[in-house]
């Protein structure tokens, strides 16, 4: 049927052009009549009825076979504004949807109309803007100009066999990362930390230190009061001009918080496909997973791992794999840094463990280091970049290995040093670590706004290792 409809549209367009040019003689007159009749038809909406409301789930009937998982609905209550919802499940011939906003005023019997699937008309006019996951401005300015072709927010990753290789080393502007967790263009890195350790501060440092054509921020479940603080204090007008901020605050519905991550990834893909180098900063993947858990439990999906339904661990790689280099010949890449909020400082909890296995490296922020006054509180012994062997030069690799060895040895004896029970002379390697580790720690300490690059970082490390 679809092919026939396309053929009719093609034939009718051809006959209209010929008719208008005065060459319609000899053509079948019934084609003209058919084309005119098709143009006069009004599109018919697919609609159903709300039959039940329970918690986050909305039960609907009458949508028929044209509705599918992921389709959007416009729910029309007897009074009040329409409510957007998304179909999340089918059960016993009924559809179950999750609202994208408050459902106050919605009641059984409300009309549900099938709406277009989510797509974003991204354009260069989005640069410098703060938007919600639907592309609606949050900065008080008019809506940005629409792109020529809207992009679907739920899109597959580029085919694995056709993706470009990772690019050259990318300077992050943070000494601890440039030394011990170096990154290449198109790499995906996780920032793992408990609450209140300094993830947001580190993200602000990265936003100011990484050389990128476009920066895309995904603020998923962010505190409402922190949005302007982040934009005005951490980002600033200069970096905002080349950035797109997608935000769904903590009071937004679960589908909106989930959609913030997909929308930000879609925006990043738009600029990557133009051949630009994109830095994607997402805070946080954990809140994305929590939104997925709310949706799954609302439609009665069984909890499997610490209350997380299986679909959560299916969606995580679908999102994270979209970042990285584009297809061969694209020229652009998405270098992505994802924060992971570990619950109770447990770095082996399910979301952290799953994300760590997907990404190309992980950086651990330690509360004890932060309490000791060293910022950023990166635990270099527990941090890893899987691309480090291909990034570090021949003269840099032994420096990093030696620094790691000294820090590891010092970690074993520092309690003895603090208690005054350590005796110099019993272990030469421990003596060296006790002497040099504080100098290495000073190299790792860096104030917010303090500039750095890999050459400066390795120069400072050489000087620290050379101290007597």
Residue ranges and their predicted role:
Residues 112, 138-187, 201-205, 240-252, ...:
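P-loop NTPase nucleotide-binding/switch module
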Residues 18-19, 23:
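Low-complexity, intrinsically disordered or signal/transmembrane-proximal segments
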Residues 179-180, 186-468:
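P-loop NTPase catalytic core
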Residues 2-13:
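Extreme N-terminal basic, low-complexity initiation segments
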Residues 26-32, 38-172:
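Acidic-enriched and Gly/Ser
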Residues 2-3, 66, 74-76, 317-318, ...:
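A broadly tuned "polar low-complexity/structure-edge" signature
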């Amino acid at each position: 049927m679809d092919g026939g409809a396309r053929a009719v549209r093609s034939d009718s367009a051809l006959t209209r052009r010929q008719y208008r040019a005065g060459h319609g003689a000899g053509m079948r007159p019934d084609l003209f009549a058919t084309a005119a009749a098709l143009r006069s038809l009004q599109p018919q909406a697919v609609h159903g009825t709300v039959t039940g409301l329970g918690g986050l789930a909305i039960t609907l009937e009458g949508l028929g076979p044209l509705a599918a998982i992921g389709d959007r609905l416009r729910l029309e209550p007897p009074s009040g504004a329409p409510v957007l919802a998304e179909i999340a499940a089918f059960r016993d011939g009924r559809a179950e949807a999750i609202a994208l906003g408050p459902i106050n005023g919605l009641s059984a019997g409300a009309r549900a109309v099938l709406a277009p699937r989510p797509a974003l008309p991204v354009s260069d006019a989005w640069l410098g803007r703060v938007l919600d996951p639907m592309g609606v401005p949050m900065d008080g300015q008019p809506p940005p100009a629409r792109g020529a072709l809207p992009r679907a927010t739920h899109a597959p990753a580029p085919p694995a066999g056709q993706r470009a290789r990772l690019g050259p080393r990318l300077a992050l502007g943070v000494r601890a990362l440039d030394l011990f967790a170096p990154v290449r263009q198109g790499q995906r890195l996780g920032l793992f930390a408990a609450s209140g350790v300094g993830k947001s501060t580190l993200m602000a440092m990265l936003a100011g230190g990484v050389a990128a054509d476009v920066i895309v921020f995904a603020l998923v479940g962010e505190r409402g009061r922190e949005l302007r603080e982040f934009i005005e204090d951490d980002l600033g007008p200069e970096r905002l001009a080349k950035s797109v901020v997608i935000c769904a605050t903590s009071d937004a519905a679960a589908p909106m918080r989930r959609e913030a991550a997909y929308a930000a990834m879609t925006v990043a893909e738009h600029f990557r496909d133009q051949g630009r180098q994109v830095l994607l900063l997402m805070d946080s993947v954990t809140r994305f997973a929590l939104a997925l858990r709310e949706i799954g439990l609302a439609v009665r999906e069984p909890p499997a791992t610490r209350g997380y339904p299986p679909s959560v661990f299916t969606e995580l790689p679908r999102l994270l794999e979209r970042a990285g280099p584009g297809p061969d010949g694209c020229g652009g890449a998405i270098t992505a840094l994802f924060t992971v909020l570990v619950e109770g400082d447990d770095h082996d909890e399910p979301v952290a463990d799953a994300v760590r296995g997907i990404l190309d490296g992980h950086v651990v922020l330690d509360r004890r280091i932060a309490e000791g006054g060293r910022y950023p509180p990166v635990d270099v012994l527990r941090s890893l970049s899987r691309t480090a062997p291909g990034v570090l030069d021949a003269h840099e690799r032994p420096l990093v290995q030696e620094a790691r060895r000294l820090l590891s040895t010092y970690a074993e004896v520092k309690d003895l040093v603090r208690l005054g029970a350590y005796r110099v002379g019993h272990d030469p390697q421990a003596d060296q670590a006790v002497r040099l580790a504080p100098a290495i720690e000073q190299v790792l300490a860096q104030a917010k706004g303090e500039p750095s690059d890999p050459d400066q970082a390795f120069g400072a490390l050489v000087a620290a290792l050379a101290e007597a």
